[in-house]
């Protein structure tokens, strides 16, 4: 009988969490519009040093409005080139410097950039538990009010290329794990951290916009986004195949023009779109 009672308690507890999560599945919008956010801690988790580019206008706006923006990159980006002259070590350092230059143009401090150092292109094959534990540690340290990440998908697994796909699910799994005291409890008992539940999420994608429910007007921050994007010399334009740390003015202007063309327009405004979610991490994909 005692076993039965315990089993019923466990089932009831699981049902309660599921019921709460289910109640939060409907489409949402933030209580306060994104352009009015202030005093928040923002954490973006991405796979590569340019993944945040899709949100650069929003991130620049949030930093300018008195929020603290942090960028966490899982890999060093040490594979993403077609230039045979570059080694992994060289490319990793190039991409780090490009990211720091981009963040400077956005107004985000350099010490708000975190790189976990995993190899580019192989994120899916890393020790998943170790990666999630590392992410949980940073979530518990920074205690973000909002997490930006690749969209893991709503009601289905969203297609991304490998590292983006891995980053989407690693971020979601870490958000869930961070709230449970007995998961990675050494961080709490030995490192002085505390469990933490992220209350709000902003998920993004590069081409699939069907699940978006929030569009941020970045018209006043387009120049910052374009200038920041132009620092990714090794990734965009001719630098991907033939890296030159000092591109010509014509090449820089071409990169800026491409960056501007990539920014979407909605109702006459330059925008960035997101799938906003607020609630328990268990229902992120619902």
Regions found by a protein language model. Name each.
Residues 8-11, 101, 231:
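A periodicity- and composition-biased signal for non-globular, repetitive helical segments
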Residues 23-142, 283:
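Active-site rim/loop-helix segments in enzyme catalytic domains that contact anionic ligands
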Residues 18, 104-107, 230:
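Charged, amphipathic alpha-helical interaction segments
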